[in-house]
Amino acid sequence: MHVRSVAAALLLGLAWACSSGPSAPDDAAYTTELNAARITKDEAFRSASDSPVPEGKRDAVLPLPYFPVDPNYAVPAALKLSADRPVFEMPTSTGALRRMQLVGELQFTLQGQPRSLGAFVEEGTQQIDRLFVPFADLTTGKDTYSAGRYLDIQPTGTGYYTIDFNRAYNPYCAYNASYECPYPPPSNRLDVEITAGEKAPGA
């Protein structure tokens, strides 16, 4: 979906965008854990040989900017599976098309309104180890990156998740135009401000 080889363990820690069930986090411990993961990501982006942030830009880009942690943006969701996993050709930042299959729709309530986001995998994926959820919202192009943000979701056996927008992150093309990053499809554009997660670089 996108190149993200920097500190794989870091991204597992940072991007557990959804857990195995809809339990609410303990606010203090949750905030502490999330802030620690953000510091770890900054350190990796600053020092890793395969950092997506060009060396000459690191002082300007790092530390990465975020909205304050808000547990209200960690919401329970149910995954409605797609019967036939239709293929979508997602435009990308390089102009190429990325063929993705829709696994299903994550259905949830946010700010009192029912909403949904499509969850995708690369075409031909046999064993799903993560679901890819690109999205845009009313902060896109303002406080957040103009091409949208991503969530990574670990599949569960129950079909129930916790979507955590505090863990929304920028695609690598936000820092370096040489990366190819899929754009969120129109169906994954939320008509609400998601003031959680990573902001646009330099915001």
Mark where each language-model region is.
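Mid-length scaffold segments of soluble, non-membrane domains
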Residues: 81-146
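Acidic, glycine-rich flexible loop segments
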Residues: 133-169
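Terminal leader/tail segments of proteins
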Residues: 87-91, 156, 187
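Bacterial signal peptide processing site
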Residues: 19-22
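N-terminal secretory signal peptides
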Residues: 30-105
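C-terminal motif of bacterial Sec signal peptides marking the signal peptidase cleavage site
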Residues: 14-17
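Bacterial N-terminal signal peptides that target proteins for export
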Residues: 1-8
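C-terminal partner/receptor-binding element of secreted or periplasmic proteins
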Residues: 173-203
